[in-house]
Regions:
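Short, charged recognition helix plus adjacent turn
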Residues: 2, 10-11, 62-72
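Short basic helix-loop element that most often maps to the first helix and adjoining turn
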Residues: 6-25
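Residues in the helix-turn-helix
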Residues: 21, 32, 46, 60
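Residues in the recognition helix of alpha-helical DNA-binding motifs
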Residues: 25, 36, 64
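Recognition helix of helix-turn-helix/homeodomain-like DNA-binding domains
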Residues: 28-42
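Short, basic-rich loop-to-helix N-cap that marks the start of a DNA-contacting helix
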Residues: 39-52
Length: 72
């Protein structure tokens, strides 16, 4: 399974928030923020904190992509 957080980064741009600011607001460790930047899977409670912080749903910040799309 592969995921992408491009939707999350777009929300941050639209709201003029940095990735670092999101990490601080949502209480996310720098290591986990690195996983997000690398489009790696993170624990559901982390995604829940992001959703609560930004007042969005899971589908607004993450999308599932087929492995063929990632490798292309």
């Amino acid at each position: 399974m592969a995921v992408q957080y491009n939707k999350l980064w777009k929300i941050l741009i639209d709201r003029k928030l940095s990735k670092g600011e999101l990490g601080k607001l949502a209480g996310i460790s720098p290591n986990t923020m690195t996983k997000l930047r690398r489009d790696e899977i993170v624990a559901l409670p982390i995604l829940d904190r992001i959703c609560e912080t930004l007042d969005v749903d899971y589908g607004d910040i993450i999308e599932h992509v087929k492995k063929e799309q990632v490798q292309a």
